[in-house]
Amino acid sequence: MSSFSRAPQQWATFARIWYLLDGKMQPPGKLAAMASIRLQGLHKPVYHALSDCGDHVVIMNTRHIAFSGNKWEQKVYSSHTGYPGGFRQVTAAQLHLRDPVAIVKLAIYGMLPKNLHRRTMMERLHLFPDEYIPEDILKNLVEELPQPRKIPKRLDEYTQEEIDAFPRLWTPPEDYRL
């Protein structure tokens, strides 16, 4: 095989692919796990820790993420200004109101390896609070990743046939009153 035919293959190997991930009703930890794999390039067979072969990840709807349980009030994000008395703590709900992309960004930042490549990988992360994505980013998208969790239906989204087909634990008698 000549070097002219091998060169395009090598460039295609290290080409950066743009992935889209929808964060609506998804836990930030699951989004971060999927995004960090793509940002590092762990999904590629040519991965090596010293090579920068990660892809771009675009996450939309970060305003509509979902925590399980009471984590909106119990999860605390801490920082320090470096000055005496500069320790700051803020709950997930307060941080989310201030900046809708901050929780997902911090989750992904924490899952990336703690080395000099981390800032470069974070530059390939594009977060958007709503469904609006700029045109120059939309034209680069190649693949949409599946959501990590299935979105549960609300009660008003069920059809009457699904409600009737749902198994009953107890059938009330005809003369039963609520």
Curated annotation (Swiss-Prot):
One of its GO terms (biological process) is mitochondrial translation. This is Large ribosomal subunit protein uL13m. One of its GO terms (molecular function) is mRNA binding. The gene is MRPL13. Transmembrane segments: none annotated. The keyword Mitochondrion applies. Its main location: mitochondrion. The keyword Acetylation applies. It comes from Homo sapiens. InterPro entries: Ribosomal_uL13, Ribosomal_uL13_bac-type, Ribosomal_uL13_CS, Ribosomal_uL13_sf.
